Amino acid sequence: MAEIKSKVTLIGAMLARPGLEFIYEGELPACEQCKVRKACNNLKVGRKYRVLSIRATVHGCSVHLNGACAVEIVESPMVGLIKADLAIANSRILPDLSCTQSECKSYPLCHPDGVVSGERYMVSEVLGNAPDHCDKGRSLKLVELLPI
């Protein structure tokens, strides 16, 4: 399996702690005039990231009260449900996010935070069967997904 590359970005100093996971939502209008905005906005919208380490560098920021802190991050794996026939370790898949049964107990795992529609992922690990029944009657497996 390929090694996951880390990168450096900036997040709010009050949020910066190892292990923090977050989903990057995009650039804010308040960032337009900032000198370091490219360092803050060097991530992909909708992707889930995990902080590995914190650097001493802190920059003034109009968005974050105590400034923005430099952190080393990696893309974080997501746990979700996929069709059982696609649940093969190290396979590359395009998750099916078309289900609209929002009242189904499995819905949050069928639409995990950080999975972007139309993007491919690698099944890094098959974790087992779905914890709840699918309202559509589909056979699902719980897996760990990594962005490709």
UniProtKB/Swiss-Prot annotation:
Coiled-coil stretches noted in the UniProt entry, renumbered to this chain: none
Cross-referenced Pfam families: UPF0179
Superkingdom of the organism of origin: Archaea
InterPro entries: UPF0179 (IPR005369)
Family, similarity comment: Belongs to the UPF0179 family.
Annotated protein name in UniProt: UPF0179 protein Mpal_0949
